[in-house]
Amino acid sequence: MGAAVTLNRIKIAPGIADIRDKYMELGFNYPEYNRAVKFAEESYTYYYETSPGEIKPKFCLIDGMSIDHCSSFIVPEFAKQYVLIHGEPCSSFKFRPGSLIYYQNEVTPEYIKDLKHATDYIASGQRCHFIKKDYLLGDSDSVAKCCSKTNTKHCPKIFNNNYKTEHCDDFMTGFCRNDPGNPNCLEWLRAKRKPAMSTYSDICSKHMDARYCSEFIRIIRPDYFTFGDTALYVFCNDHKGNRNCWCANYPKSNSGDKYLGPRVCWLHECTDESRDRKWLYYNQDVQRTRCKYVGCTINVNSLALKNSQAELTSNCTRTTSAVGDVHHPGEPVVKDKIKLPTWLGAAITLVVISVIFYFISIYSRPKIKTNDINVRRR
């Protein structure tokens, strides 16, 4: 019978490419069993990513070891941005805890498992593995810099995503109450987050005549028109004498609405195209596009009465506009320019030039000399 396989020699040799890598050369009494097991012992402190979005120190966390061993390999700044997850299975020498045995060539998890008494010297564990995850800022100054976009260089994504998430809502609510015309506040409002719309509804209920309230109304209509209607109602209820509010809160009078229809179709404060839409409730804004009439102004310079009859004539068709739902009240109106045929301008020019040349030719001709003829009648 042959002798049993015994381990005669163990030698640790350093790696070449990476100082963390080492080789454990195992010499047996039978040379065919000799092995060179490659392993690593982590010694770096990571301030960079080993691959996009993750850090994987060469450390095998075996049972009974604290996870603090993993976090000791990354700098404090990264510790705020990365979280530890369950890494891949690994093996480590018990007499060199944390060492990471490389699986390569004949050295596989199955090979180690089948070795007799292997568990006395080799332990199983999980490799330290960190992935990047957005994190919350710990101080108000950092939140202010990120949300106001004063300095976004080191801001986590959740605080630097054009206000798509709720993380800046608390800061922006207070910030924009003090400076509602700030471009960043208007960008926050354009994200159509309800805290932003509610904030501007409260602001415009006191300052509806401000320019930023025009943008507020444009943004919220039609989907969230109630925020604007509430602001207009409160403002006009507190400023009844403001002429801008006469369409939304007209002095009580039954005759106009009774005989002329909805006041949004005839009252100057409603129909004047130069007026801002923010002074109309949303339903008035829609109604104004559906008024079934053509309005005009009649100027009478003289009035002649004959047989108790008066006749007035006014051309109301020259300002005729389309009837019905012309456009959505949430979209700006673009007036079409009057297009004339291209040949018409050339024809008019040719006629004018011909007339000019005709008169020039007539007046440039020399006068015809004639003799005076005396005629006497008997």
Swiss-Prot record:
GO terms for cellular component: membrane; viral envelope; virion membrane. It is found in: Virion membrane. Most cysteines are linked by disulfide bonds. They are created by the viral disulfide bond formation pathway, a poxvirus-specific redox pathway that operates on the cytoplasmic side of the MV membranes. Residues 2-342 are virion surface. Disulfide bonds: none annotated. One of its GO terms (molecular function) is helicase activity. It is a single-pass type II membrane protein. Induction: Expressed in the late phase of the viral replicative cycle. The chain crosses the membrane at residues 343-363. Residues 364-378 are intravirion. Keywords: ATP-binding, Disulfide bond, DNA-binding, Fusion of virus membrane with host membrane, Helicase, Hydrolase, Late protein, Lipoprotein, Membrane, Myristate, Nucleotide-binding, Phosphoprotein, Signal-anchor, Transcription, Transcription regulation, Transcription termination, Transmembrane, Transmembrane helix, Viral envelope protein, Viral penetration into host cytoplasm, Virion, Virus entry into host cell. GO terms for biological process: DNA-templated transcription termination; membrane fusion involved in viral entry into host cell; symbiont entry into host cell. Belongs to the orthopoxvirus OPG143 family. This is Virion membrane protein OPG143. It comes from Vaccinia virus (strain Copenhagen). The lineage of its organism: Viruses, Varidnaviria, Bamfordvirae, Nucleocytoviricota, Pokkesviricetes. The gene is OPG143.
